[in-house]
Curated annotation (Swiss-Prot):
Location of this chain's protein in the cell: Secreted
Cofactor dependency: Zn(2+)
Cystine crosslinks: 310-314
Name of the gene: lap1
Identification of the protein by name: Leucine aminopeptidase 1
Family: Belongs to the peptidase M28 family. M28E subfamily.
Residues carrying sugar: 87, 288
pH influence on activity: Optimum pH is 7.1-10.
Enzyme category, top tier: hydrolase
Domain of life the protein comes from: Eukaryota
Quaternary organization: Monomer.
């Protein structure tokens, strides 16, 4: 591991901490900007890096978990189907996706002044979202389905909605619920309709429709499916790191994780004269799972894919990868054609193309159903 100035003392202290003992400092944070590239910063410096477009893990107090994650990764070997197996069922479910539901949820979700993870707004928005998830569960009558908050050292909780299957083999669908205005992180207006309100409503609607399937609702799928709504992504993948660190500690058998972060902006693509596409991220992901994701898009979406890279620590799939779990990431476009309004007051619902969100809903539903019923994982 390569250390930048002033890191050695703090890293030595961090390595002595027990896994999960995330001692925080108001003054200094340890950021991982790339494999083996770490830097100690103040909070102001942390946000300055984000404003420069730098992405990172905040690994303050987490150093001792990295070796365990590496060991876990070496043991994982998952074989995914080479074609879709449930086309008729999934196509019927896709017909139940309701584009109006995206806007119905996203409008009030983006009306919170912000969803900053350290703020009361972040806490309240998480509680509001949990209520919406519970409404879906209650209306479905599904057996044993739950939504639970996952607590962190900051006020906002992540949320985990679980659909039990016949085994503990688990498929995870993720999006992040927090928001930030990088000009004023704690106080600034940050509707974040696209980043990542669009991802939240994408997987929420897929969750609703998945529960209309009788076998899924009865717990008869071979594998368990979880929908994760991560807190603190903008602060350095904080919520997802906590979750996947705990899953590693508990030897949770996660067979696949798909992240949906920004699913609604298409103007950058079309203005560039390019076809509307699903961006498939190819760095810091599992190659085999990414190939399977492309199979899903080809089968269940009506637009093509485009390969792209997003850099180190760019969204919560990177936390799954870090802790040894196979992950993939579907994005609204190729990087560079994505929304220019993120992290500002201008990331509003008016910038979101709900037809494109629907395409992401189709792939989410197909991904979840095909892997929920995959016996060979």
């Amino acid at each position: 591991m390569r250390f930048l100035p002033c890191i050695a003392t703090l890293a030595a202290t961090a390595s002595a901490l027990a896994i999960g003992d995330h001692i925080r400092s108001d003054d200094q944070y340890v950021l991982e900007l790339g494999p083996g590239e770490t830097k100690v910063v103040t909070e102001a410096e942390k946000w300055a890096l984000r404003a420069e477009g730098k992405r990172f893990f905040d690994i303050t107090g987490r150093t001792s978990s990295l070796e365990l994650a590496s060991n876990k990764k070496q043991k994982l070997a998952v074989t995914y189907p080479d074609s879709v197996q449930h086309n008729e069922t999934v196509q019927n479910l896709i017909n139940s996706l309701d584009k109006k539901n995206f806007e119905t949820v996203l409008q009030p979700f983006s009306e919170f002044h912000n969803r900053y993870y350290k703020s009361d707004n972040g806490k309240k928005s998480s509680e509001w979202l949990q209520g919406k998830i519970q409404e879906i569960i209650s209306a479905s009558g599904a057996k044993g389905v739950t939504v639970e908050p996952f607590k962190h050292f900051f006020p906002q909780s992540s949320l985990i909605a679980k659909i039990p299957g016949k085994s503990d083999k688990t498929i995870v669908l993720g999006a992040h619920q927090d928001s930030i205005n990088l000009n004023s992180p704690s106080e600034g207006r940050a509707p974040s309709a696209d980043d990542d309100g669009s991802g939240v409503v994408t997987i929420l609607e897929a969750f609703r429709v998945l529960l209309t399937d009788e076998k899924v609702a009865a717990g008869e799928a071979p594998n368990t499916v979880e929908f994760h709504f991560y807190a603190g992504e903008e602060g350095g993948l904080l919520g997802s790191q906590d979750i996947f660190e705990q899953y590693l500690q508990k030897s949770r058998d996660v067979k696949a994780m798909l992240q949906q972060d920004m699913t609604g902006y298409t103007k950058g693509t079309t203005d560039a004269g390019k076809p509307e596409s699903i961006g498939i991220i190819t760095d810091n992901v599992d190659e085999n799972l990414t190939k399977f994701l492309k199979i899903i898009v080809d089968a269940y979406c009506t637009i093509p894919t485009v390969d792209s890279k997003c850099g180190y620590g760019c969204s919560d799939h990177a936390s799954a990868t870090k802790y040894g779990y196979p992950a993939a990431f579907a994005f609204e476009s190729a990087f560079g054609d994505d929304s220019p309004y993120i992290h500002s007051a201008d990331d509003t619902i008016e910038t979101v193309n709900f037809d494109h969100v629907l395409q992401h809903g189709r792939l989410t539903l197909g991904f979840a159903y095909e892997l929920a019923f995959a016996d060979s994982l």
